[in-house]
């Protein structure tokens, strides 16, 4: 798993040196978005690590139902927040690409299967109060549904098959490969920022903040 720590090394090269520059607002937007994109990517990584650690302990608790239930509650809480953080990282990436003048890439993300899966999970978790109280046969499964009862959300959430969790028509693999598309987007965004802001501004910023600039970027 990856940790992202570029923001504090490069924000001086992104933000304007003086007030009143024509692209001042845009540059502050990019700086702020990069800061929070890294925060949510790192939250996602931290939650993933917690999930994997807790998952390994479940098999040792098969004879201790109370502790097993407790650990599963913690694990699915971490999965919940991991998915919310992933969706936030996607949304921040889309906004950054729009501001950086890459609307086609932003639209590609919106239509990608990776984003659709995470967004579906996040939307259903956010609106679980509706999902838990409305009969819905759209995603019924033979192993829990009958003609009188089909609370699909309640039956599917907090169940896993191997590394996969299923919700409605989508499955999410709790594996590093599920994060690679999001990481690649970050790398694309950071390259754009490097080419268009960091490299062109580095000499002037280093002169203006001599002795106070980040040691490396």
Which residues does each predicted region cover?
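Aromatic- and Lys/Arg-enriched surface recognition patch
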Residues: 133-150
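Histidine-centered, metal-coordinating catalytic motifs and their short helical/loop contexts
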Residues: 112-137
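Amphipathic alpha-helical interface segments
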Residues: 1-114, 146-217
């Amino acid at each position: 798993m990856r940790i992202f720590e570029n923001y504090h090394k490069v924000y001086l090269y992104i933000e304007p040196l003086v007030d009143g520059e024509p692209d001042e607002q845009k540059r502050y937007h990019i700086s702020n978005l990069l800061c929070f994109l890294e925060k949510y990517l790192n939250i996602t990584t931290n939650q993933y690590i917690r999930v994997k650690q807790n998952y390994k302990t479940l098999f040792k608790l098969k004879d201790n139902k109370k502790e097993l239930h407790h650990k599963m509650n913690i694990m699915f809480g971490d999965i919940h927040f991991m998915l919310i953080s992933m969706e936030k990282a996607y949304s921040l990436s889309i906004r950054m690409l729009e501001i950086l003048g890459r609307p086609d890439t932003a639209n590609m993300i919106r239509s990608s299967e990776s984003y659709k899966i995470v967004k579906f999970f996040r939307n259903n978790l956010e609106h679980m109060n509706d999902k838990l109280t409305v009969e819905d046969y759209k995603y019924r499964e033979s192993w829990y549904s009958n003609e009188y009862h089909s609370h699909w959300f309640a039956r599917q959430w907090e169940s896993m098959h191997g590394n996969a969790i299923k919700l409605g028509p989508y499955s999410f693999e709790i594996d590093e490969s599920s994060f690679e598309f999001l990481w690649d987007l970050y790398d694309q965004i950071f390259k754009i920022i490097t080419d268009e802001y960091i490299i062109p501004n580095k000499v002037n910023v280093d002169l203006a903040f001599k002795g106070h600039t980040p040691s490396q970027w």
